[in-house]
């Protein structure tokens, strides 16, 4: 990958809401911190207040001229969250369609019947595969059902160092059994916490695997897609502009944006305890708490990034530029 000049909107300015809806998960992966699954903040109470606060947030941005939104839900495991359906329905009521997007990061542990009933609520689905817990047959069954129905359907295989070959084999199974697929072979970050470093694989063959196997994809049958403008493009050194590939940015070590202008006011990260913060990196201020019904409409402008590296793929999508190209995103 070439060096990056800037990351820019696909079309018009848009707002990203990245929401870790709770900290409860039915999986207990050894590489995952207890803070992601223990259930200290399940957020299953006072759902109407949560929905009303989301509405307040969206109306604020709409008053500022924003029409397109992307809601990206993770956990924990968000498909088990009691507020999931009412939250997504309220979001869809206020976002502009076509053009906006609801995405979800799930472990595919819900049955096929659930996905048949609710898949219409989501444009993008990232299905993480966890070698210690995922049920391979069930995962494949759901993936095959969704393969021609989503704008974006990605199998994100978490490359556990002790189950590395199992992960490789499962990726091969998807490629053999599915007509359409996108597979990301994802290096595991130690404890999956923002402050930690990437996991360093001890065996050379595992390190070598990532050099040639970042992302693979195929489309053999038509996909029902609606236009989406809530995404980003990468502007490269040679002036080519391509859709952003967040996994490649990580695996090729391009996630270093210190000193760049970053429009963190166009991104909200909602933590499991309800805290609303501009971006997920910790640089932006806290602007409310969604489970307490609080939102401060006085948001900061873009910042010159002080961090050595950007740890969260969702933050890669925020408009950002090297100083000499900052005017392109103001």
Segments predicted by a language model, with ranges:
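Short loop/turn motifs at secondary-structure junctions and domain boundaries
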Residues: 62-63, 258-262, 278
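Radical SAM/AdoMet-radical enzyme domain recognition
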Residues: 54-73, 81-184
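Glycine-rich short-loop/terminal segments
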Residues: 24, 33, 57-59, 68, ...
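Radical SAM enzyme [4Fe-4S]-AdoMet core and its adjacent flexible, acidic
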Residues: 124, 128-267, 272-273
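Canonical Radical SAM [4Fe-4S] cluster-binding loop centered on the CxxxCxxC motif
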Residues: 6-52, 280
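Short catalytic/ligand-binding loop motif for oxyanion handling, primarily in non-cytosolic enzymes
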Residues: 38-41, 80-82, 112-113, 163-165, ...
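Flexible mid-to-C-terminal extensions adjoining Fe-S/redox cofactors in radical SAM and related proteins
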Residues: 1-13, 35, 271-330
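Residue-level signal for mature regions of secreted extracellular proteins and peptides
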Residues: 18, 22-25, 71, 255, ...
């Amino acid at each position: 990958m070439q060096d990056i000049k800037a990351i820019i909107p696909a079309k018009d300015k848009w707002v990203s809401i990245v929401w870790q809806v709770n900290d409860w998960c039915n999986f207990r992966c050894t590489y995952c911190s207890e803070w992601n699954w223990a259930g200290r903040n399940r957020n299953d109470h006072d759902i109407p207040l949560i929905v009303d606060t989301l509405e307040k947030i969206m109306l604020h941005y709409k008053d500022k001229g924003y029409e397109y939104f992307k809601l990206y839900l993770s956990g924990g495991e968000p498909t088990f969250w009691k507020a999931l359906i009412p939250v997504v329905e309220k979001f869809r009521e206020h976002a502009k369609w076509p053009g906006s997007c609801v995405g979800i990061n799930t472990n595919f542990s819900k049955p096929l019947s659930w996905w048949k009933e609710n898949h219409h609520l989501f444009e993008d689905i990232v299905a993480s595969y966890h070698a210690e817990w995922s049920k391979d047959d069930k995962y494949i069954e759901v993936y095959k059902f969704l393969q021609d129905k989503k704008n974006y359907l990605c199998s994100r295989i978490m490359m556990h160092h002790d189950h590395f070959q199992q992960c490789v084999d499962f990726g091969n199974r998807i490629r053999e059994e599915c007509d359409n697929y996108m597979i990301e072979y994802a290096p595991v970050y130690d404890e999956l916490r923002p402050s930690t470093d990437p996991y360093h694989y001890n065996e050379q063959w595992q390190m070598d695997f990532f050099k040639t196997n970042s992302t693979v994809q195929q489309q053999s049958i038509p996909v029902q897609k609606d236009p989406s403008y809530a995404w980003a493009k990468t502007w490269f050194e040679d002036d080519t502009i391509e859709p952003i590939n967040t996994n490649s940015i990580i695996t090729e070590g391009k996630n270093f944006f210190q000193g760049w202008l970053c429009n963190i006011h166009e991104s909200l990260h909602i933590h499991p305890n309800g805290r609303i913060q501009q971006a997920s990196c910790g640089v932006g201020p806290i602007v409310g708490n969604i489970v307490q019904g609080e939102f401060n409409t006085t948001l900061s402008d873009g910042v010159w990034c002080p961090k050595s590296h950007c740890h969260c793929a969702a933050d890669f999508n925020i408009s950002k530029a090297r100083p000499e190209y900052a005017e392109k995103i103001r």
